Amino acid sequence: MAENQNYGTGRRKSSSARVFIKPGSGKITINQRELDVYFGRETARMVVRQPLELVXLTDKLDLYITVKGGGISGQAGAIRHGITRALMEYDETLRPALRAAGFVTRDARRVERKKVGLHKARRRPQYSKR
């Protein structure tokens, strides 16, 4: 299976994605399902395709992706990060364009923890002056 393929790992929130890139016709498979079947939301599909559209390789590469953990948004972000890393392994000259678009940087934002005495992370109980 290791014939002429490139690999990239992507993470976002609590999601982790493993991306394998091979020369092909532009087929994207996520957890043995098509991209359109796996992600019902158009925004998630758009996020996944962003790095490929940026470097104009949408119909030249096949992608095989396994993703675990998190929700739709986190998984889409993790896949985008993994595709970016795999593309850089595939062709190092793509790095400046991907960096300029902000795809290379790992989004380190996490869910803030709930604090004692508050409703949520920052939401305080209603204050009554009298």
Curated annotation (Swiss-Prot):
Coiled-coil ranges from the UniProt annotation: none
GO biological process: translation
Pfam families: Ribosomal_S9
Segments crossing the lipid bilayer: none
Listed InterPro entries: Ribosomal_Su5_D2-typ_SF, Ribosomal_uS9, Ribosomal_uS9_bac/plastid, Ribosomal_uS9_CS, Ribsml_uS5_D2-typ_fold_subgr
Source organism superkingdom: Bacteria
UniProtKB keywords: Ribonucleoprotein, Ribosomal protein
Presence of the UniProt keyword Metal-binding in the record: no
PROSITE patterns: RIBOSOMAL_S9 (PS00360)
Name recorded for this polypeptide: Small ribosomal subunit protein uS9
Species this protein is from: Haemophilus influenzae (strain ATCC 51907 / DSM 11121 / KW20 / Rd)
Gene from which this protein is expressed: rpsI
